[in-house]
Amino acid sequence: MTNEHKDQIRIVQETVAGKEITFAHVMGGPDPIIYQKLGLNPQVDYGSSAIGIMNMTPPESAVIASDIAVKSCNIYIGFADRFTGTLIITGEISDVTSALTQIIDYFRDTLEYVVCKVTKS
């Protein structure tokens, strides 16, 4: 070992996924092309429709979030991935907003997750 490397320390840093909802967003009245590009049902009333998207860790949490969403509001599951923690729901704007809020509340209050606010566009 040369002198220039003698005083260097090698640090290995690992991250562990925590219990967290990192993203929760409602897209009110999205353009029909967004439905098509996401592979969602394009046969909806676009005037009052919405898409809700969430991301969470650990990724299996998306299964629980899906269950809460369908039991709490009149929404449809567009996509739920237990490997990435992504959940996409569709429905009326009020139902999608309410479902995301119900999920956030349950994960924060019951499961003690760190959660974000629900944002809207």
Predicted regions mapped to residue ranges:
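Positively charged, small/polar-rich N-terminal and surface patches that mediate targeting and assembly
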Residues: 1-66, 70-83, 90-121
